[in-house]
Amino acid sequence: GARAANGVIVVTTKRGKTGKPVINFNTKLTYTPNLNTSRLNLLNSEEKVDLELQLLKEARFDILWGLTDPIAVFPEKGKVAAIMKQYNLIDIYKEQGWNGLTPEAQNAINKLKTINTDWNDILFRDAFTQEYNFSISGGSEKVTYYNSLGYVKENGNVPGVSMSRFNLTSKTSYQVNKMLKIGMSIFANRRKNNTFMTDTYGLINPVYYSRIANPYFDPFDEQGNYLYDYDVVKSSETDEKQGFNIFEERANTNKESVTTAINSIFDVQLRFNDQWKVYSQIGVQWDQLSQEEYAGIN
């Protein structure tokens, strides 16, 4: 069955027929390619570094309020500004430009242009969905039956996001006599969803983060340890506890929900003749939803 706004829609077309047992099995594999972000025309590392250099040179400040330029520029954000602050060169750069920077600062800034992190490639993936269905049906003149089992495993384009569903259907009809026919149907399914704790505009949401993360930021060092992004949070780079790494966050958060539903339907049919029939149906449904959210202290 499928849940509707005011109840449950039950598909009753699949029923057993008189005759020898009929066995069916089918499987389906669905491929969902990785997201295509080429049309977004995002900046690469060289373009982003050049933009930061331009904005940093053109921004104006005052002592009390900081920025006076109407352009929304935050000189403390961005790796270019961090490098200049490290060498105490922001004022010199504003007066003398690129040639006023020390060779060490120039080399550090130029190195940023060589790092091009493909966030679409490391945050998303190609995904596959597997579906299996098995059924057996048959019966005699008095009793017919239809039983089926189904299983679906769907992986999301984001690693760690998945859905699995198991469903069972059992239908039996009894022809008591020429007038009376009774039946019983049972529909059961269990659905499990795995994802992460986030919201639409949360940094842990890869769709959102991949659009604001700098292309020159590498989330791991050469040993595979986490590196932290200080440009997407309101914090200072001197405060290591406030740095952000989406992979560390996702490794320490989890959200799992399990939904179980069982629906039983009993029906009675009285047949007086070909023109006159009376049909009655009653159903009972049981639902259970459990949800678990986890967020580590890190």
What are these regions (language model features)?
Residues 17-115, 126, 156-161, 167-261, ...:
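Surface-exposed loop/interface segments of Gram-negative outer-membrane beta-barrel transport/assembly proteins
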